[in-house]
Amino acid sequence: MSNVPADLKYTDEHEWIRTEADGTLTVGITDHAQSTLGDIVFLELPEVGKSVNAGDAVGVVESVKAASDIYSPVSGEIVAINEAATDAPEDVNGDAYGVWLFKIKLAAGASIDKLIDADAYSKLID
């Protein structure tokens, strides 16, 4: 069974989301996603400053088995990317919840209401 921390929010597309003290959201891929993909060999992340809508494909994660889009969980502006993750994408396999991919600032009027909690995500992947 995959590890699903209770303090995070999730998407149906297997991204995890952590709300930071300053209100920005930190986004990564779940343990289930990295396990399903296998050995991750490449990450393409969005550009800092880019405005995105919820559900937009903003990046790609490639493994030895497949390539999969990374989606924005909310509408907003990309404010940071984890360049260390692009340099060592295999680190996501070892610590999916410790290796974040990008940070996003919510757009005015956007919310996190459509994100799911750990219980709902656990049911989705079981």
Swiss-Prot record:
Keyword Metal-binding assigned: no
Cofactor: (R)-lipoate
Modified residues (N6-lipoyllysine): 65
Gene Ontology CC terms, in alphabetical order: cytosol; glycine cleavage complex
Cofactor-binding details, from the entry: Binds 1 lipoyl cofactor covalently.
Cross-referenced SUPFAM superfamilies: Single hybrid motif (SSF51230)
Any GO BP: glycine decarboxylation via glycine cleavage system
Keyword line: Lipoyl
Subunit structure: The glycine cleavage system is composed of four proteins: P, T, L and H.
Summary of the function given for this chain in its UniProt record: The glycine cleavage system catalyzes the degradation of glycine. The H protein shuttles the methylamine group of glycine from the P protein to the T protein.
The protein, known as: Glycine cleavage system H protein
Species per Swiss-Prot/TrEMBL record: Burkholderia orbicola (strain MC0-3)
Gene it is expressed from: gcvH
